[in-house]
A protein has these predicted regions:
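Hydrophobic alpha-helical segments
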Residues: 1-207
Length: 207
């Protein structure tokens, strides 16, 4: 999601607004001061844009700071590669039927993390050709679908595939981030400011 420490990208083409008005008002970067302004600067440096989701988070700078810090820590010091992180995000977004998060992570997954369009689509289904990524997605799918309940058999399979307890904790952290951003984007009713991807795309044969 927004504020990942990656090279700036061209401003994505924006789809037609979906909502007549947001439920939570985004903070205008031009009017931001203090810590909020600094966080916006860091976000723009990373992404080349300041997404609507970050602007909504900025209503509470502590939340925005915490989100940025967690995402930055996982991205720079975590054990999961960028492509695996984006696969998890795509899976969680699809399970949540989150068009906002799907739009963000399809763009980031294919433009930043190096996923092909086919790999991004497979990730939404919880599938991957790489055995390691497949094991990660299998566990992430269990976490998001069963609300954190993971069977002994599932954990045994994860460990057999080479995942440590540390990996499991890190995967759950990424799932939680995806759930948080989905709920915030949905509650705020913000417009999608990334190239639009709908959770129904593959049902219509367009994914």
């Amino acid at each position: 999601m927004p504020a990942l420490p990656t090279p700036a990208l061209p401003t994505p083409a924006l789809p037609t607004p979906a909502f007549p008005a947001p439920a939570l008002h985004p903070v205008d970067p031009e009017k931001a001061t203090g810590e909020t302004a600094s966080l916006f600067t860091a976000t723009h440096r990373a992404l080349g844009v300041i997404p609507q989701l970050a602007r909504v988070m900025a209503n509470n700078p502590t939340v925005l700071r915490g989100y940025v810090d967690v995402v930055t820590a996982l991205s720079t010091r975590g054990t999961l590669s960028a492509d695996v992180r984006e696969r998890i995000a795509l899976l969680v977004a699809q399970e949540n039927r989150s068009d906002y998060c799907l739009s963000v992570h399809t763009f980031r997954g294919t433009k930043v993390a190096g996923l092909t369009t086919a790999e991004a689509t497979r990730a939404r289904r919880g599938e991957a050709g790489d055995p390691w990524a497949a094991a990660v997605l299998d566990l992430a799918a269990a976490v998001v679908r069963d609300h954190g309940v993971v069977s002994d058999e599932r954990l045994d399979a994860a460990r057999h595939a080479g995942l440590s307890d540390g990996h499991v904790v890190e995967i759950i952290a990424h799932v939680a981030l995806g759930v948080f951003t989905h709920h915030l984007a949905t509650a705020a009713r913000i417009d999608i400011d990334w190239p639009l991807v709908r959770h129904t795309d593959w049902e219509n044969g367009t994914a």
